Amino acid sequence: MDKFTLQSDEIESILKNHLKIESKVMSIETLLGNVRMRKKIVYDPYYQRNYVWDTDKATYFIESILLGTEIPPLVFFKTEQGTIEVIDGRQRYETLSKFLNGNLALTKKGLTSLKSLHKQKYSDMNEKIQDLYLDTKIRIIEFSIVNEPKLTDRQEDLIKKEILSFQPMQLFG
């Protein structure tokens, strides 16, 4: 394998023979409340777009969680160094974190059903709602490369790009 590039057959070989895919379910409390876990997660790798959700969209997302709506999974890539990069779901991940850390007050415009939560931050909510939020399960799909010679950063980026081009059924079908 060339040190700087991967040919399509090399990418295919890595994806078929060396790509480990794990599906996990984790509570928001475990995902964001565990200091050790939080230190490993890089939610803003250089190839991700910046956080772009406005407070109305972020509010709508938080309300969806509180109402029990199914949300798309977060997609992680575990590097050889043990860090976990968010390769899909940065907006969702960062919104979850902002809300829990008190950096997001819910807006009237973003709330469709739970209007009484207008202007509230996580810390303003009653314990029942806080527990509901923390106990909410988030689906996570985690990719990693196993049994493969060390990849360069560029090669790893090419693999991540390929992962993002899959449709969900291609991953598990």
Regions found by a protein language model. Give the residues of each.
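Basic- and aromatic-enriched surface patches that contact anionic nucleotides/nucleic acids
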Residues: D2-D9, I14-E22, P45-G173
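N- or domain-start disorder-to-order transition segments that initiate the globular core
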Residues: E12-V42
